[in-house]
């Protein structure tokens, strides 16, 4: 597994170069190519195969990749940002002034005293102040969110949040407003150390006038709270009923149709498949001093079967996160070889996986889950969908995660300059011992699956007699008074178009182990995953891209806000907690704990990792300064991009 990512990326570069230089038949293809497409330089149309669900303002209702992209486009001035140059989080220097500092109080809490710039505005011209950030924390972590179908954000890292979430106090002690443009954020000592500590300050401002009209944020010295703006002794206006209307209204609710925003663009319309945006004239720019140039953006769901044709016809100016092997190859052959288009490849910080319903008798059994995992031909399924642009996954990680890259040898940590030769040698030895080798991989083996099921007592047929594979279709087991058959249902998102491959490489092998699998598609799988839909299922086929601040505890803890019906495991939660409670900068210790977490993951097998892959973005050469590999999202990269007929000057020449 050593350097597998480097090899994969090298392969993609070789393929890109080969298609750019030409290939057999390329001249004929070019001869028949349509005339040069003329783009509307005032509008960029972005296409992706990943659907939008409309959670454009908060992650309390889901975190789909496309929704995250929209959030980054329309919400700005987060207190923190990811600095790719140092591979770490930092306070955003365009939002927080240099006079801000962090101290430790007598209780061991970390207190961040932040001073904000006074030149930030919402898209309607309203000034953004410290009160807007305070409202954001109060809203996202409020117990009212769960009353209207969302997941209250767990903020146990904030001092006093547990009392606020439980309704014991109306105020949030860990957030204080000390001036119109100054905040104090207190991180609880119980949560420290935290490897991604600065990421805990993740917060966009939200306009209280749009979400909670008639309310205001106050702070009497104990922490921030929400009260009536007028008639403070009257009935509280900040209620679940109010938020249900202002957040979830299908026409103008702030969750899916926010009008007043703080980002580079503002949302003009959204119909479920297409979102339109225009420049926010009040946006002052990002920390690099860049302001958006392209006046309008259209973001829409693209069809894998037609997206390359649409790119060549000028219907798209950017295809984002292209995954399917045949689509990538088609784009390379017909777009890149033509010479007027560009391709950017970057490793995915996530994976596709199959999650189990831990509330079902069959899939609650870890031995059943292991047997099911052995019946999935990951390599074949991967080849069918992402081909040479991906690798099968044997753990809960993605190719783009820094931990995977370090442990697999793609990148390395240099020893400190002051180390002696002996210390350097020991340092390297310690890193060599941190490896993915030896982890259970559940290689495709239906024979072993049958052995596991036999040993686990799944040895009866539907008549309650001994199971005989030569004449019985389904294994059963007596659990209590119920005879439970291994008749299972898997649901996958209709946009993935992977149903046929699942039939061949998963459902068919499962039959050999006495498991009958029904495969169904759904346009809304994520609401099931987040517990917002009561659809019956045994397994879900999903994909995720991890946050840079990797913290999987919510996935596996009782009462977690994601994977609500999934398998829970206290030991996994414990190991995830130990992983995050690592001193900042101690990469070796963090990766060592990460390996322990992955080992337990394979012992429990709460999910079946399937594959991780390299994403491709395709765009015409006239879209310039689009540097997706330096950012987390296309929405960040597009701020510095522009259309121009003048060829982009190479970086070396520019210097």
Regions found by a protein language model. Give the residues of each.
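Aromatic- and charge-enriched surface segment that lines or borders ligand/interaction sites
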Residues: 98-153, 178, 184, 310, ...
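Ligand-site clamp/hinge motif
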Residues: 250-256, 273-276, 282-331, 516
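Surface-exposed binding/hinge segments that line
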Residues: 150-240, 411-419
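N-terminal lobe/hinge region of extracytoplasmic solute-binding protein
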Residues: 44-107
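Append "and occasionally in soluble cytosolic enzymes with long acidic Gly/Pro-rich linkers
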Residues: 364-507, 596
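Gly/Pro-rich hinge or "lid" segments in bacterial periplasmic/extracellular proteins
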Residues: 199-292, 296, 446, 450-452
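Detector for C-terminal structural segments
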Residues: 274, 375-424, 498, 502-507, ...
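Periplasmic binding protein-like
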Residues: 46, 125, 311, 317, ...
């Amino acid at each position: 597994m050593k350097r597998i990512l480097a090899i994969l990326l090298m392969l993609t570069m070789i393929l890109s170069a080969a298609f750019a230089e030409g290939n057999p038949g390329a001249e004929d293809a070019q001869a028949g190519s349509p005339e040069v497409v003329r783009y509307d330089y005032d509008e960029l149309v972005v296409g992706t195969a990943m659907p939008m669900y409309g959670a454009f303002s908060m992650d309390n209702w889901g975190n789909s990749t496309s929704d995250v992209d929209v959030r980054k486009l329309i919400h700005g001035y987060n207190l923190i940002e990811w600095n790719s140059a140092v591979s770490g989080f930092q306070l955003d220097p365009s939002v927080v002034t240099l006079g801000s500092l962090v101290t430790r109080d007598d209780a061991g809490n970390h207190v961040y005293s932040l001073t904000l710039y006074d030149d930030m505005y919402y898209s309607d011209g309203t000034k953004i102040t410290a009160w807007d950030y305070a409202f954001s924390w109060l809203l996202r972590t409020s117990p009212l969110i769960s009353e209207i179908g969302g997941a209250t954000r767990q903020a146990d890292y904030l001092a006093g949040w547990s009392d606020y979430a439980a309704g014991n106090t109306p105020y949030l002690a860990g957030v204080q407003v000390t001036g119109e443009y100054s905040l104090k954020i207190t991180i609880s000592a119980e949560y420290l150390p935290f490897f991604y500590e600065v990421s805990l300050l993740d917060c966009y401002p939200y306009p209280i006038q749009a979400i909670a009209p008639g309310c205001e944020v106050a702070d009497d010295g104990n922490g921030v709270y929400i009260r009536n703006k007028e008639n403070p002794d009257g009935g509280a206006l900040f209620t679940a009923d109010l938020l249900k209307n202002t957040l979830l209204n299908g026409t103008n609710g702030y969750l899916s149709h926010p009008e007043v925003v703080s980002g580079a663009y503002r949302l003009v319309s959204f119909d479920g498949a297409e979102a339109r945006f225009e420049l926010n004239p009040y946006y002052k720019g990002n920390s690099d001093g860049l302001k958006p140039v392209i006046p309008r953006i259209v973001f829409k769901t693209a069809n894998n079967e037609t997206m390359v044709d649409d790119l060549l016809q000028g219907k798209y100016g950017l295809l984002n996160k292209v995954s399917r092997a045949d689509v990538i190859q088609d784009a390379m052959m017909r777009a890149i070889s033509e010479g007027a288009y560009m391709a950017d490849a970057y490793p995915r910080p996530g994976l596709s996986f199959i999650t189990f319903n831990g509330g079902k008798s069959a899939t609650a059994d870890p031995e059943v889950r292991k047997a099911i995992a052995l019946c999935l031909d990951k390599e074949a399924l991967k080849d069918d969908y992402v081909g040479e642009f991906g690798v099968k996954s044997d753990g809960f990680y993605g190719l783009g995660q820094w931990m995977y890259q370090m442990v697999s040898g793609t990148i390395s940590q240099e020893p400190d300059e002051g180390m002696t030769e002996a210390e350097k040698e020991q340092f390297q030895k310690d890193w060599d011992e941190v490896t993915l080798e030896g982890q259970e991989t559940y290689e495709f083996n239906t024979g072993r699956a049958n052995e596991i099921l036999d040993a686990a007592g799944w040895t009866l047929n539907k008549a309650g007699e001994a199971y005989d594979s030569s004449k019985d279709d389904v294994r059963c087991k007596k659990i209590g008074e119920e005879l439970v058959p291994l008749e299972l249902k898997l649901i996958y998102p209709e946009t993935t178009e992977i149903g046929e491959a699942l039939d061949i490489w998963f459902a068919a092998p499962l039959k050999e182990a006495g498991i009958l699998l029904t495969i169904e598609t759904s346009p809304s799988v994520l609401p099931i995953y987040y517990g917002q839909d009561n659809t019956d299922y045994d397994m879900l086929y999903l994909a995720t891209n991890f946050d840079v601040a990797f913290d999987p505890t919510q996935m596996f803890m009782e009462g977690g806000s994601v994977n609500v019906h999934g398998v829970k495991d206290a030991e996994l939660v414990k190991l995830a907690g130990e992983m995050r409670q690592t001193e900042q900068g101690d990469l070796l210790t963090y990766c060592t704990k990460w390996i322990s977490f992955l080992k337990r993951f394979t012992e429990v097998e709460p999910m079946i990792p399937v594959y991780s892959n390299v994403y491709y973005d395709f765009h015409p050469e006239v879209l310039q300064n689009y540097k997706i590999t330096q950012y987390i999202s296309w929405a960040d990269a597009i701020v510095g991009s522009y259309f121009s007929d003048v060829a982009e000057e190479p970086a070396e020449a520019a210097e």
